[in-house]
């Protein structure tokens, strides 16, 4: 039976390793801590030393860049089953490049990156898991860059709805606008236009079946 003390990391790592068990899991269990975060609470700030990796048990988070003038740009969101870390902070002496805030009341699991590296050095399944998670992170980053550089604002909104239909319902519009590189007013106009086009297509499809 799979350990359930820290289900988020267990599921994440075993799936990444392609196995139902991981050697020396007890070492990871001892290093993982569970944290409850209230809506609006901060997981970590931008510009601090924080060499930890997180897995989301429950809830929703936003990962944001904060400019000197207070302007916030949201790089991504993390919901149940997702993981996150500031890669720059995982290097010796490194600091976080962004901050993380809870959109909903949530539960997180946290582990020191050094523990993961030590396990990967000793055990091939752990090395495979970390490699696969690195690929997942890189693929997300690549997709995000492609959308920002090649899609129109409406295209980015439609792509987000297609990729994250349920998540879109949980994210405040102001946060979604900051993620898509829009103003809330601009996003509202796009959302209304998209809804009208969907309604129009649905009506046309219905009429076609009636004739």
Give the positions of each predicted feature.
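Cyclic nucleotide-binding regulatory module and flanking cytosolic helices
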Residues: 1-36, 89
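Hydrophobic residues at beta-strand termini and immediately following loops
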Residues: 35-37, 78, 111
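Cyclic nucleotide-binding regulatory domains
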Residues: 41-103
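Polybasic "coupling" helices that flank or enter modular domains
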Residues: 101-184, 189, 193-194
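Short Lys/Arg-enriched helix C-cap and helix-to-coil transition segments
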Residues: 199-203
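Conserved small/polar residues in nucleotide/adenosyl-binding loops
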Residues: 204-211
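Generic structural signal for secondary-structure transition and capping sites
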Residues: 33, 37, 83, 165-166, ...
């Amino acid at each position: 039976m799979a350990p359930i003390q820290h289900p988020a990391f267990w599921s994440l790592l075993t799936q990444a390793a392609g196995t139902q068990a991981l050697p020396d899991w007890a070492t990871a269990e001892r290093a993982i801590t569970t944290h409850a975060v209230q809506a609006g609470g901060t997981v970590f700030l931008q510009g601090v030393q924080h060499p930890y990796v997180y897995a989301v048990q429950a809830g929703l988070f936003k990962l944001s860049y904060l400019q000197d003038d207070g302007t916030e740009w949201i790089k991504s969101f993390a919901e149940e089953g997702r993981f996150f870390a500031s890669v720059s902070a995982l290097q010796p002496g490194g600091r976080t490049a962004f901050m993380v805030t809870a959109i909903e009341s949530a539960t997180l699991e946290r582990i020191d990156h050094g523990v993961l590296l030590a396990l990967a050095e000793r055990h091939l399944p752990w090395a495979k898991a970390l490699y696969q998670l690195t690929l997942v992170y890189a693929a997300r980053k690549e997709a995000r860059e492609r959308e920002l550089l090649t899609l129109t604002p409406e295209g980015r909104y439609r792509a987000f709805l297609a990729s994250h239909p349920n998540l879109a319902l949980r994210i405040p519009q102001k946060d979604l606008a900051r993620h898509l590189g829009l103003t809330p007013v601009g996003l509202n106009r796009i959302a209304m236009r998209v809804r009208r086009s969907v309604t129009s297509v649905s009506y046309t499809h219905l009429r076609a079946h009636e004739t």
